[in-house]
Amino acid sequence: MSLDRLRPFRRGVVLATTSLAVAMVLAAPPDRARAQARAAAPAGAPAESAAALAARLQARYDAIKDFTADFSQTYEGGVLRRKTTESGTLLVKKPGRMRWEYKTPEEKLFVADGRKLYAWVPADRQVTVSALPSGDAPATPILFLLGRGQLTRDFTPSLPGAIAGAPPDSVAVALVPKTPVPEYDRLTLVVDRASLGLRMLIATDGQGGTSTFVFTHLRENVGLPDAKFAFTIPRGADVVAQD
């Protein structure tokens, strides 16, 4: 199978996993609150259940209005059988607006304006347009950006134990969708044990591929204007509409 034929698959994986990554990052408290939360955690407290941890993550996400960050993403294994690393910036505004701008090594842009989702790859001169999922859709990551998804309702959480590369004083929660979806099989979140600050997000797909995300320079509730999430189809670009 040629690399060109694999591109649509890889971009679909990117879109699905990055969308839920946003939701999980929004669930983490800001950096300035982490030290306070860690100090307030009682020593010797009993281990928290996976369901309780997922519920706290959801509650934190529900309180966030908008969000900006830099990100890096590493994908390895799967159909491509090789390792790739990409980076860029993201903007998120609820309900249902996001802007993922990949800068290296290849420019790509994913924009959701609240109704439509646009995927633009300048090298291909192609824009893919699709509708955002409805509230009765399966547990797609984008539903969390729309304010319709619920971790404990849509996923079965569990505590997977030690995760390779996880920092000290962290805890992991694995999320398996109750309704199977094609984009991924499982998501694993590694968060600070006391503050829920996100450290790692690992998404595993059905082809054996793994995406690992790292977010830096997080800023919450900055008052992002809707204009940041408008997309104009470039002149001369091919447009592919997806149901």
Region spans (language model):
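N-terminal leader/targeting segments and the immediate start of mature chains
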Residues: 31-83, 233-236, 240-243
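Bacterial N-terminal signal peptides that target proteins for export
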Residues: 2-19, 29-30
